[in-house]
């Protein structure tokens, strides 16, 4: 009887372990610095971000938490800005993903900034050589509207790939950026935006520790619509006038620790409308990222 009782107890422990509820676990931690800059714009370094990232998992659910701080940097007294470093913005971001099928994930994201809050619906689909992904979000502004129109109207925005193809180390997708204001717009202010791109990705080298990648973003066309008539002076990207190239590197320091970086440069060709004089501001864009990630 004692042996039978021990056997039944052992079977009970095994059964409980087999059907135990999933646990919330930390899957990764990391930090990232991103520097975004447009030539001849507000600051010498427009946006300098420090991000702290945490990844979690619970069964088929995955979560991401991000807290960030942004500064503007000026090396001299120019552009109506004082020399030095100024705190300008912050970010709190929460990501939730649910694996629906082997091919499809659905997600939600909240992103909060000083002047706006965003609420995203997301998807990520991949089957064979076909893929699709995207974000659609509502942007609720918190600003006063004293500086620009975008500070006082809400938006519905989207960035998505309706269709993409992949083969081996190469991937290409058709990308759409669409935005529409919600509520009352000022006369002659932009209230709708449409941009079409082709984006391509490739792994250039993959070794035991080092991986090198590249990404290209090529704008086909970009259009804006206005509330009422077009303003007397404005500009937009010319057809094929916005093209960005990234080079990235990821190095595996250990089984769990990776360090990575990437650099992007965007070439811009503006089309001037109306009586707009030659404008050389924001004629190029640069993006630099460096970070580390520890996976458990």
Question: Which residues make up each language-model segment?
Answer:
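Short glycine/proline- and aromatic-enriched beta-strand/turn motifs that initiate or cap beta-hairpins
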Residues: 19-80, 287, 293
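Repeated loop/turn-to-beta-strand initiation elements of outer-membrane beta-barrel proteins
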Residues: 24, 60-65, 99-106, 128-136, ...
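Transmembrane beta-barrel strands of outer-membrane/channel proteins
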Residues: 28-37, 65-69, 106-112, 134-144, ...
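Residues on the lipid-exposed face of transmembrane beta-strands in outer-membrane beta-barrel proteins
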Residues: 52-58, 94-98, 121-127, 158-167, ...
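Outer-membrane beta-barrel "beta-signal"
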Residues: 251, 265, 280-296
